[in-house]
C-alpha cells in the first residue's frame, strides 16, 4: 500500500456512548503542506526527519507538531487509527490515549489540570478509569 503525502484522520473517543473525536492526527511528508494548506517547518530544524505529525482537537487552544523519522510506519498506524502503535513509536504523540485502558478519550472524559510555569507548561490528571496521565506539550 502506498502511503499518502498528507493524511488527516479523526481518532474517535472510545468512552462508552461518546460520539466526539478524541483528536485529529495528521501526517505529512517532509516539506509538504497539511490538508488545510498550512506549512510546517520542523523539517528545516530536523533535517533527518521524513515528515511531520500534528495533533489537534484534544486540548483547548493547543495543537503540536513533531518530527517523524519513519513516515511509512506512522502513516500506517494513523490510517487504521492505531493509537497503541503511535504510542509505541513515541508516547508523546498520542496525549489522548491511555495505554492502561488501551483506549482513546476526548478531552471531556479526561480529568486534566493545566500547570503554567514560565515556559514549562503541562497537563496532569487521570483517564476515566483513574490512570495517571502527564502531557508535557501544551
Residue positions per predicted region:
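Intrinsically disordered, low-complexity acidic/polar tracts
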Residues: 10-82
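Short, non-ligating residues that shape and space the ligands of small metal-coordination modules
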Residues: 24, 107-108, 112-115, 133-137
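Acidic, proline/glycine-rich low-complexity IDRs
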Residues: 122-138
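Short cysteine-rich clusters marking metal-coordination/redox-active sites
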Residues: 13-16, 98-101, 127-130
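Short linker/helix segments within small regulatory modules
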Residues: 88-92, 98-100, 111-125
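N-terminal export/targeting and maturation segments
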Residues: 2-8
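Alpha-helix-centered segments that form part of catalytic cores
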Residues: 74-98
Amino acid at each position: 500500500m502506498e502511503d499518502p503525502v498528507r493524511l488527516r484522520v479523526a481518532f474517535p473517543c472510545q468512552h462508552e456512548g461518546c460520539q466526539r473525536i478524541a483528536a485529529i492526527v495528521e501526517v505529512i511528508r517532509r516539506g509538504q503542506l497539511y490538508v488545510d494548506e498550512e506549512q510546517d517547518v520542523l523539517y528545516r530544524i530536523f533535517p533527518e526527519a521524513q515528515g511531520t505529525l500534528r495533533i489537534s482537537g484534544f486540548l483547548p487552544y493547543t495543537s503540536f507538531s513533531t518530527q517523524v523519522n519513519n513516515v511509512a510506519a506512522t502513516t500506517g498506524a494513523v490510517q487504521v487509527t492505531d493509537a497503541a502503535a503511535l504510542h509505541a513509536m513515541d508516547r508523546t504523540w498520542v496525549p489522548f490515549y491511555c495505554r492502561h485502558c488501551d483506549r482513546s478519550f476526548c478531552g471531556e472524559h479526561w480529568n486534566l489540570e493545566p500547570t503554567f510555569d514560565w515556559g514549562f507548561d503541562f497537563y496532569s490528571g487521570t483517564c476515566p478509569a483513574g490512570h495517571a496521565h502527564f502531557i508535557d506539550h501544551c
